[in-house]
UniProtKB/Swiss-Prot annotation:
Its EC number is 3.1.-.-. NCBIfam families: pelota. This is Protein pelota homolog. May function in recognizing stalled ribosomes, interact with stem-loop structures in stalled mRNA molecules, and effect endonucleolytic cleavage of the mRNA. May play a role in the release non-functional ribosomes and degradation of damaged mRNAs. Has endoribonuclease activity. Monomer. PANTHER family: PELOTA, PROTEIN PELOTA HOMOLOG. The keyword Membrane does not apply. One of its GO terms (biological process) is nuclear-transcribed mRNA catabolic process, no-go decay. One of its GO terms (cellular component) is cytoplasm. Belongs to the eukaryotic release factor 1 family. Pelota subfamily.
Length: 342
């Protein structure tokens, strides 16, 4: 997601949609009564015939529809503004928002929580290290929201039949990757390359630091061409998505462990979480996407805003998440506490 323009006085935010996760977040954030401005098409009668005409309209939102693993968000509502010659003001219409589209969202008041989630989504494309490796060369790059920055590019001695050279090259590449991990502060790496050599480098990295999250993929060469090949694939979005799921899974594991030990450091259900938040006790909170959309929006928005003000971490669990049903069984909203409140 890319923020193109924000007008605080008007309450308008212009965005460029870059991936499916952006659409899902907009499904959560766009509420009934909000307004959007977007390009669309509509059937217009032309005498006996009708034609589908492209136009830009302003829509007052009634509801949104999003189906997981699609690339489209359907926004239903009433047309507030459109070209006069078509005479469609006040009519019902559905805007189909897709990857690559731009949209302006207008709200009476943007919550800090909503703006923070959008900024987080924009910043996601910023902390990913990519290392392409082969037996005698490597290239290391940092993927940022501004683009790709090459950090290192080097040719090494060709091993031939000398295993010592192979091991030396593996050692150098692994240490170089680890040094850039520390320098950039990333915690997710993609290692790619032709053949099995990439797996050997991955094993060496795991020996040095087994806490790093490493994804392995194949490309035709450890070069800039190979880097472009990797960037054209879906693995980048997949890595970000899986990393967020892994974070949520760790929180849930801690929640379940504390529940089993009866430590008093877990609360679930809206009322108990409200009480915990009043005391500043909410540390990490998991909330299912349908709980977020089905519950009274003003109540839940106010609660989430206050939790974030008090430095609590909130993670929204989508329906396709492997932990969705476990969180759903805990009422759909569950929190790990900083301290006992009973």
């Amino acid at each position: 997601m890319k923020i193109l323009e924000f007008n605080d006085k008007r309450g308008s935010l212009k965005l460029h949609v870059e991936n499916e996760d952006d659409l899902w977040l907009l499904h959560i954030i766009i509420k009934k009564g909000d307004r959007i401005v977007a390009k669309t098409t509509r059937d217009i009668s032309m005498g006996k015939d009708s034609r589908r005409i492209p136009m830009t309209i302003e829509l007052q939102v009634e509801y949104t529809e999003f189906q997981n693993f699609t690339t489209r968000l359907r926004i239903h509502g009433l047309i507030l503004d459109a070209p006069e010659r078509f005479g469609i003001k006040g009519a019902h219409h559905t805007v189909n928002l897709d990857i690559g589209d731009e949209v302006i969202i207008i709200k009476e008041q943007w919550s800090n929580y909503e703006l923070e989630k959008i900024r987080e989504q924009e910043e996601k494309k910023g902390k990913l290290l990519i290392a392409l490796v082969d037996v005698d060369e490597y290239i290391i790059a940092l993927l940022m929201k501004q683009g790709v920055k090459i950090l290192a590019e080097k040719s090494l001695q060709t091993p031939g039949k000398d295993n010592d050279v192979v091991n030396e090259n593996i050692e150098e590449m692994a240490n170089e990757i680890i040094s850039f991990v520390k320098l950039t502060g990333v915690n997710v790496i993609i290692i790619a390359g032709p053949g099995p050599f990439k797996d050997m480098v991955n094993q060496k990295i795991k020996q040095i630091d087994n806490k790093l999250i490493v994804y392995v993929d194949s490309v035709s060469s450890a070069s800039r061409a190979g880097l472009n090949e990797l960037l054209r694939r879906d693995i980048i979005d997949q890595v970000y998505r899986e990393f967020e799921i892994a974070q949520q899974l760790k929180i849930l594991e801690s929640i379940m462990e504390n529940l089993a030990k009866n430590t008093g450091l877990v609360v679930y259900g809206i009322e108990d979480i409200k009480k915990a938040n009043e005391l500043g006790a909410v540390d990490k909170l998991l909330i299912t996407e349908d709980y977020l959309t089905d519950t009274g929006r003003e109540i839940i928005d106010e609660l989430l805003r206050d939790i974030e003000k008090k430095k609590g971490k909130i993670m929204i669990v989508p329906k396709d998440s492997p932990i969705y049903y476990q969180v759903k069984n805990l009422t759909g909203i569950v929190s790990l506490l900083r301290f006992r409140i009973n």
